[in-house]
């Protein structure tokens, strides 16, 4: 496993995490659990059964999207958003416990859309135009990225490394960022990388690419870790 961060200006804590992951490669694993609500029932169920907490806790940022159109949202969407509100408080608590963070963002489309507009079927937002400077789609993309950067900045200020996994499951067409194909999704990822490392200097992020498709790979210079979402039947 490569231990040199793809961001040449990455904070030392980023390299420390990558070094540790390299040291345990082939020898052990880190357990993790994704959560989405303030109650985090999954985490406490794990502790109830094992007496321990996982090493990694995943946090969902969907409610932090700036373009949530509540007037178009159904009851299920509103419930999901409301239950997710404030979960970054739990992320800070996890930091105080010494755990590792990973963030996922079901990003409501930057303009337009209705209901759960992170789904492609709920928006006409064109990801292929979002990477073209000067387009309304690009301006909206930058606006949302600035908004999220403000949320991430306090973690950067305290040198808290984050496994940052944007545009997840980009191999599929179900999210707006994957609807125009894996190459467009990869370009979105590269755009975010450049914007966050060169403009916002979020040097605490560990960049995680999430797709099994080689044709959609962003390149080693933009990615620290390759991941994949797998679902099994209950």
Task: Describe the function of each predicted region.
Residues 1-58, 62-81:
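N-terminal module-boundary/linker segments of secreted carbohydrate-active enzymes
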Residues 7, 48, 195-234:
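Surface-exposed substrate-engagement region within the catalytic domains
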Residues 11-13, 181, 234:
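Alpha-helix capping and helix-coil boundary motifs
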Residues 16-17, 39-46, 86-89, 147-151, ...:
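Alpha-helical scaffolding within the catalytic cores
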Residues 28-33, 54-61, 100-105, 162-166, ...:
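Structural recognition of the beta-strand scaffold that forms the well-ordered cores
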Residues 30-32, 51, 98, 201, ...:
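Glycine-centered flexibility motif
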Residues 36-38, 62-65, 108-111, 168-172, ...:
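Solvent-exposed loop/turn segments at secondary-structure junctions
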Residues 67-191, 198, 202:
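Substrate-binding cleft of extracellular glycoside hydrolase catalytic domains
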